[in-house]
Amino acid sequence: MPTGGSTAEQAEPFFVTGFQRSGTTLLRMMLDSHPEVAIPLDTTGLWARAERRLGEFEPLEEEANRRRLVESLLTEERIRLWQVPLSVDEVISASSRPGYPGVIEGFHLAYARSKGKSRWGDKDPGNMVRLPSVLGWFPDARIVHIVRDGRDACLSLLKQPFGGDDLLRCAEQWREQVGWVRQIGKILGDGRYHELRYEDLVEDPEAALRPLARFLDLEWSPQMLEYHRRVEESVPEEKRHIWPLLDRPPQASARYRWKREMSNGERICFEKRAGRVLAEFGYETLPGGASGAYLTEAMLAAGRVRAAVAGRLPGR
């Protein structure tokens, strides 16, 4: 693999993933600010959904069928949110990969070229549970996994309209998904899997990003630290409310909010379900695991309290 200056045709694609509200968008913005890299807004399961419809367009070896598939995908909302007017010809001609992976790569390469860049990546938290599909499409892909303390990730997620209201279920999902991705990473090995923590990224961005750049065979670029100056061109206005802090440098104060916002009961209940995995990722947990004094409080508080704080339970 060449280092720095590598073209999209020479370099493997990479996929950024992580549990929801764990800094995937922040990391996407930083990488997208590199002069060689283009990562559009989340595809949010688009490629998996389209794969289930491939029977309507087969065989893809026939260009007419590939064109029909691309035409269909160009009408998707997730592609519109990329804010780049792509044509069927641009997508078809961008990639020489055969079959459906070539269509996916064609979209990403066409997007990258529209930005004057050579390297493409995809960012989607949902890829945590779809990694077998991703690796089936792109056996040479590299995986970038950003991990955030599950207590903070869940607190943030439950404040979102799409986040649900069950803290305990969120704890279980965080435990299962980050553990699952790490296990896949062990199979892939260090050459194809890179893991970093959100807390380290916001505390010292350059120290966290330099190893990631090396992993992706990219030369270091200080432009990655200037991501907050590019929000208007990189995030559609209709979506900016989801990430209100993107237009400023990393906020170290965003770390460990659970210490201020979680009750003892919520913390114990969360750690009952995910404490072992929290500890495996180097996060602080109660000595000896959650037990005893606050258990009743925990069971009463879990799930409902976070929804009440977010103002979504009428009359509370």
Named regions from a protein language model:
Residues 38-122, 127:
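PAPS-dependent sulfation machinery
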Residues 18-19:
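P-loop (Walker A) phosphate-binding loop of NTP-binding proteins
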